[in-house]
Swiss-Prot record:
GO cellular component: cytoplasm
GO annotation terms (biological process): rRNA base methylation
Any one GO molecular-function label of the UniProt entry: rRNA (cytosine-N4-)-methyltransferase activity
Protein name: Ribosomal RNA small subunit methyltransferase H
EC number: 2.1.1.199
Record's subcellular location: Cytoplasm
Family the entry assigns: Belongs to the methyltransferase superfamily. RsmH family.
Gene giving rise to this polypeptide: rsmH
Length: 310
């Protein structure tokens, strides 16, 4: 699989995070290496770039792209291992960290990865092929109550219970093994009137299953907790999100770093020990321009938030 990936908010992210050409920067979501390539173009010979990706194909692509560049360190690992990996590489602290939380276009477009509801393929959705839990396992073996909660919580799918009822009935007859089979089940479950409105009827269900299979939100929370420890004072973290669940986690985490007092108003003196660890570089998230959205419709829902360690 070749990575032909259109990077979102490229200049805005790199301009906001990379400020010291001799610094060490971490791309936690290497993907097609679009952000990493631009970061490298901004670094001097003393600068360093660390790229994380749990997909071995992304690592292979980056090895080919950056072959022979001594500034580049590639880690075939989920970014949940950020702090441990940087310690083992003896690269702490770092001057910047960036995350692009969108599924890379090759993963969406290559049918065999099983992420897309637009192409029929094996029902998979694993970012890391070594992950024992696939979407096929989850759909065929997950309890109905758990599946309904996943679709509602991670996909905000209002037809979650009805979709799961149809899934349970279908899997009684035979295992659901392909994306096409699952799409057909979802279409049968959602009333015709509702299917004609809004996005593709399978979009929310596929998003929810992908998040659950890869524990995306849990991994993000744990990684952000590490980021603030990994950054040098003045270092920045930039995070691009693509849906409200991710953005809420980033917003709440950044706000928790501001050190605002949480004591009741009746307390004359702060007792909670609040201490500011970071500041927001921009009060509101940065959004793609109309021109970028026109050129790359997948950018439409992107939001960029940047924080700076004090």
């Amino acid at each position: 699989m070749e990575f032909h990936h259109v990077t979102v908010l490229l200049k805005e992210t790199v301009d906001g995070v990379v400020r010291d050409p001799s610094g060490t920067y971490v791309d936690c979501t290497l993907g097609g290496a679009g952000h990493s390539g631009y970061v490298l173009s901004r670094l001097s010979e003393k600068g360093k770039l660390v790229g994380f990706d749990q997909d071995p194909l992304a690592i292979k692509n980056a090895q080919d792209k950056f072959a022979g560049d001594p500034r580049v360190f590639l880690v075939n690992r989920n970014f949940e291992g950020l702090e441990e990996s940087l310690q083992s590489l003896e690269l702490l602290p770092v001057q910047g960290v960036l995350f692009d939380l969108g599924v890379s276009s090759p993963q969406l477009d290559e049918a065999e990865r099983g992420f897309s509801y637009m192409q029929d393929a094996e029902l998979d959705m694993r970012m890391n092929p070594q992950n024992p839990l696939s979407a096929k396992t989850l759909v065929n073996e997950g309890k109905a109550e758990m599946l309904a909660e996943i679709l509602w919580k991670y996909g905000e799918e209002k037809w979650s219970k009805r979709i799961v009822e149809f899934i349970v009935e279908a899997r009684k007859q035979k295992s659901i093994t392909t994306t096409g089979e699952l799409v057909d089940i979802i279409k049968r479950a959602i009333p015709a009137g509702a299917r004609r409105e809004g996005p593709h009827p399978a979009k929310r269900t596929f998003q929810a299953l992908r998040i659950a299979v890869n524990d995306e939100l849990g991994v993000l929370e744990r990684a952000l907790d590490q980021v603030i420890r990994c950054l040098a004072p003045g270092g920045r973290v930039g995070v691009i999100t693509f849906h409200s669940l991710e953005d809420r986690i980033v917003k709440e985490t950044f706000n928790s770093w501001l050190g605002r007092c949480t004591c009741p108003p009746v307390f004359p003196v702060c007792q909670c020990g609040a201490r500011a660890m970071a500041r927001l570089v921009h009060r509101k998230p940065i959004l793609p321009s109309p021109q970028e959205i026109e050129a790359n419709p997948r950018a439409r829902s992107a939001k960029l938030r940047i924080a700076e360690k004090l």
